Regions:
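C-type cytochrome heme c attachment motif
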Residues: 72-79, 119
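Non-catalytic, surface beta->alpha helical segment in thiol-disulfide oxidoreductase systems
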Residues: 3-23, 27, 116, 121-151
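A short beta-strand-turn-helix
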Residues: 39-65
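Hydrophobic beta-strand anchors of alpha/beta hydrolase catalytic cores
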Residues: 66-67, 97, 120
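Typically the conserved alpha-helix immediately C-terminal to a functionally engaged Cys/Sec
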Residues: 76-90
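Sec-exported extracytoplasmic/periplasmic mature domains
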Residues: 48-53, 89-92, 145, 149
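Structural microenvironment flanking redox-active thiols in thiol-disulfide oxidoreductases
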Residues: 87-111, 136-143
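Short pre-active-site segment immediately N-terminal to redox-active cysteine/selenocysteine motifs
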Residues: 62-65, 69-73, 116
Length: 151
């Protein structure tokens, strides 16, 4: 991961044998409550926000969404995924959890100027997305509770 504030690059090992590389067509996307669901650009445009039709972010959903932009070569991303899976289960009836493979969805990453991974979007039903780069799972829970669920 990269810490732009401190101008440092951190390399952290992970077990490549644990990496699951998924290829998903637009018609194969199935989003389930309580899961961290892989999505494509097509799904994003249809159900989250169609940036081709509006420059202002207009969320299409009826439940808050957490979107993880990740890559298989990103150690911090790979360690974050199990934490997000736990959060997806914990908030299964309140928040939808999605993940976007940054290597496969370059256009989507480019549209949002994603320059560091992991980058996580927290999208409330009403309002602008909250974007976090490299924060801790505890910070994510705080954002979900205070911003998305307004607890």
């Amino acid at each position: 991961s990269i810490d732009y504030g401190k101008r440092k690059v951190y390399f952290q090992p992970f077990d490549l044998a644990e990496v699951k590389d998924e290829v998903i067509g637009a018609d194969e996307v199935k989003v389930e409550s309580g899961k961290l669901n892989p999505i494509t650009r097509e799904y994003f445009l249809e159900y989250v926000y169609d940036y081709r039709k509006s420059s202002e972010f207009v969320f299409k959903g009826d439940k808050p969404v957490v979107i993880d932009f990740w890559a298989t070569w990103c150690g911090p991303c790979m360690r974050l995924i199990p934490e997000l899976e736990k959060m997806a289960e914990k908030y299964k009836d309140q928040v939808i959890f999605l993940k976007v493979n940054a290597d496969k969805e370059k256009e989507l990453c480019g549209m949002f100027n994603i320059v560091a991974l992991p980058t996580v979007f927290f999208i409330p039903v009403n309002g602008k997305p909250i974007v976090e780069m490299g924060a801790t799972p505890e910070k994510y829970v705080e954002i979900i509770e205070k911003q998305l669920l307004k607890k």
